[in-house]
Every structure is written in structure tokens, then in C-alpha cells.
UniProtKB/Swiss-Prot annotation:
This is Poly(A) polymerase catalytic subunit. Polymerase that creates the 3'-poly(A) tail of mRNA's. The gene is PAPL. Pfam families: Pox_polyA_pol, Pox_polyA_pol_C, Pox_polyA_pol_N. GO terms for biological process: mRNA processing. The keyword Transcription applies. It catalyses: RNA(n) + ATP = RNA(n)-3'-adenine ribonucleotide + diphosphate. The active site is at residues 192, 194. Belongs to the poxviridae poly(A) polymerase catalytic subunit family. It comes from Deerpox virus (strain W-1170-84). InterPro entries: PolyA_pol_cat_Poxvir, PolyA_pol_cat_sf, PolyA_pol_nucTrfase_Poxvir, PolyA_pol_nucTrfase_sf_Poxvir, Poxvirus_polyA_pol_cat_C, Poxvirus_polyA_pol_cat_N, Poxvirus_polyA_pol_cat_N_sf. Its EC number is 2.7.7.19. Keywords: ATP-binding, mRNA processing, Nucleotide-binding, Transcription, Transferase.
Amino acid sequence: MNRHISEILEKYLGRIPSLTEYHTLKSQYKNIHRVNIFNKDIFISLIKKNKKKFFSDIDTSVSEIKKLVFDYFTKQEQTYSIGKLYTIIELQTILVTTYTDILGVLTTKGPDIFSSNVQYNTSSMQKIASDALNSMNIATISDKVMGRHNVSSLVCNVNSLMEEYLRRHNKSCICYGSYSLHLLNPEIKYGDIDILQTNSRTFLIDLAFLIKFITGYNVILLKVPYLKNYMVLKDQNDSHIIDSFNIRQETMQHIPKVLIDNIYIVDPTIQLLSMLKMLSQIDRLEDLAKNPDKLTIRFATLLEYVRNKYGIILNGNSNNMPMPATIDIKKRIITVDTKYYNFAYDKCYVYLDENSLSSDILSLNADDAVDFENVSNSAFLVNDKTLYTYFSNTVLLSGNDKIHEISSRGISAHILIYQALMKHDISIPLTDIVNSLIGRNKQPIYEIIPRDKKTGKHGIIDIEKDIITH
């Protein structure tokens, strides 16, 4: 038994380690030593500053914060399960090595904010957006309440923190969705702030601890199997606080961005295409039916941005958009004719099952597929003048084996997302797809082809119960 390691473990556990504890935990002695020497007083002062700046409405005393912190950092002394000890060590290590740089820094003076003038008056676009969405308002309203609509009372506090976080960490974290559009158009209301970042797990763990030490709430982190690299933070009532997609730094570098008030947002062009794509999902059409006004102002803002950026003339001349597409329902593959545009391929095979795409890419023996993770929700491969990709939403039919225009437009938008992420010029097809929204009549839904079913178990990080499952 190494005496130095044994002393580190004894100090950490508050007891002489058993032989089992020694031999299973000795590989962690460096991390344990970091926890042992961690200055809790400085840490508590950072928590106090975070509370004052972002959670001032929470009624927690300094003594309560101290107790919660010291209780957690001595929790191992009353824990004898090796599995739970490993969990405590892992979470404590993340906290002591990352908290200051990730969340503690938010309380210090930040760089000057360079105010942006990238704001849009969307009044001229309201009618076009409203008419376009009205032509797509064809779903029956569902009474089902989606999990994303159960919002925690802490969202406003976390939003305040996130605004500062996005400014301080704008190389590793960017936003999209309603908050990003609020920066373009202050009339847009937003709930939580949607983010993409390169260190999502670490950030959410640090945030979970901050909330725990300020509120005493037993918040948990959930990893959802059907959304890649996605984690959501929930409060003790199972209500949504914030979620985040993790992406690689390589993907982050590919994403077109716009800087507004020191915050990077996903280029609204990508967001418009993503919205057109998402409208093929039946759940989103149900949301549209429930609250068309909410989507109209967002849609109008995106259209106005794209019109300005690309100089698009809105005349209803859509040329070849949406691109012609046929579906093989049995194989669940859609073939899109892309030859009308200056792409590096003449057709596109759009798979509705991701495993089938992966299998076919493997059989092609090609190693140059690209994957933009949650930005595109698909890998892409160009091989022999054909683009191979996967579409993650439902596909609507307007007749027997006939793809509904909403879905064919969504699939065309998906292809344009690939073109944009690869830094290709999309001005002509983008102009056409925007004009394809004008002067359309409602088409009823004949059939809904279901989306790919993802299997797997939820992963969980529960600080209170010392559980980490992957």
C-alpha cells in the first residue's frame, strides 16, 4: 500500500480506507488530491457573487449556501458504495477544475459590448409570412403537452446568466431559436435560450451545482437517446430549465454566424432553412395550428433577414423549388432531382432511416462523409454525382405516393443547409425556395410517413443520488 496515496484517501474519506476502497480508488488519487486542497471559501464567494448577479430573487442565506457546499464536499465520508464514490469523485473533480473558468468568470467585469445595428423592421414581411404559414396550417390541433412546454420558474434566472455566458464564451457557445431572433427583432418573445456548445456536459454540471447550492433544489441532467449529444437540465418538479446540444469544434467552425452585441447567433439563413425543414414534422404543424401568430413574427424576421442579405426579389417565381422528389415508401428512401442547380451532384438519396444510410455509406467504401451533428441532424456523402443524406422528420403525403409540398420544400431546405455549411453559394436556390412560399394554396394531408424511431435508454446525472448513467 502506497503511504502517500493512502493518506490522500484517508483525508478525503474521513476514515482509513478499506482494502477494497484503496485498490479501487487509488487510480483517482490525483483527482481526489485536487478536491482535498480545493479552497471552498473562495468557491463560496464565487457562488455568492453568482447569486447576487443572477439569482438575487432567491431567498437563501450565506450560511445556507455554506452548509450546502460543505455538505456536498464531505458527502463521501458517509458513502461506502464504490460506485457512488466514483460518481462523487467525478462530479467534484469537474466542479473544482472547471467552475471558475466556466461560471465563476461571469461575475467579473467583461469586455465592452459593441452594440449592433442588425435589427429588422418586419412589417413588410408580415403579410407574406402570414399567408405562407396559413397555406401550411393544415394539421389538427393535438391536446398532447410536449415536455418542452413544462417550464421551470428558474428559467428567467438562467436566461440572465446565459446572456452573460454567451458573451464571455462566444468561441465555444452560440445560440439559435427565439432568443437569437429577439436580438434581431425585440418584438419577438422568448422562453429559454437555445444553445450549441463544445463543452455542454461540463457546463450543465457546473450550472446544476450552482442551482443546487443557491436553491437547495435537487436538479438532474437527462440525456435523451433520440436526440444526439443532447442534455436537458430539469428541476425537482421535472420542469425544463435549460437544454444544450454538444457539437465538435470542427462543426462550430463550419456554422455561419452573425455577431450581435458580442453574442454569436446561428446565421438566420440556416435558421430559416431549418424552420422550413421542421415544418415537415407533424408536431410542428400542430404547434402552428395552436398559435400561428407566434410563428408568424419569427418567420417574418427570418424572411426579412434573408431578403436583405441576398437581395431577394419576392415575385413568386420559384423555378425548380421545391426540387422534384419521389418516394419509395417500402424502402423509405426519397430521390430528389437536383440537376437544375449548380451542385456537385445531380440527384440526392434522402433516407428516412439513419441506420440504412450508415449501412449504405459503409458499403460504398467512401471515407469522405461529413457530419454536422445537430446542425443538420445527418451525415452527408457525395459519391458518383449523388448526395446521400438522412431526413429526421415525418414526411407528409398529399396523395398516393405523392410527397406534400411542405415536405418536399423541407427536404430541399435540408439539402441547402448542406450547401451552406460547405460554404457553397446558395443565392439562386435560396431565392427560389423563398419564392416557393408565395401564392400557395392549402393541400390536405393524405398520409404521414413516420420519422425514424430511435431506441435506447435515457442517461441521467443525479447529484443528490450519486448516479451517472450513460
